[in-house]
From Swiss-Prot:
Protein name, entry field: Nucleoid-associated protein EUBREC_0329
Family of the protein in this entry: Belongs to the YbaB/EbfC family.
Subcellular location: Cytoplasm, Nucleoid
Keyword DNA-binding: yes
Pfam family, one: YbaB_DNA_bd
Keyword Zinc attached: no
Record note on quaternary structure: Homodimer.
An example Gene Ontology CC term for this record: bacterial nucleoid
Biological role: Binds to DNA and alters its conformation. May be involved in regulation of gene expression, nucleoid organization and DNA protection.
Major location (coarse): cytoplasm
Amino acid sequence: MARRGGFPGGMPGNMNNLMKQAQKMQRQMEEAQKQLEDAEVTAKAGGGAVEVTVSGKKEITKVKLSEEVVDPDDIEMLEDLIMAATNEALRQIDEQSQASMSKITGGLGGGLF
């Protein structure tokens, strides 16, 4: 009796469909990653006194400071505001990335993405 479809060793023919779905998911993930790389988010701290823009590649592309926060006697506050805005922008990029990957994987991956 001849076997139809499947792989040697008795794997079912549905394995072909599974492989096709995996390849499709991989293409979608690559496409989503490209879109994320092109994304930018801007986060503000200190009521908008400090703005930091981060790319999807997690590179800081812009830092904007309001004159009122540039106080030579309080550099520590400025440093804190820059750090807060940067961390928030990075958090937003991570959130976008996770949401995008979740759409593709349907929640699969156990936190790998």
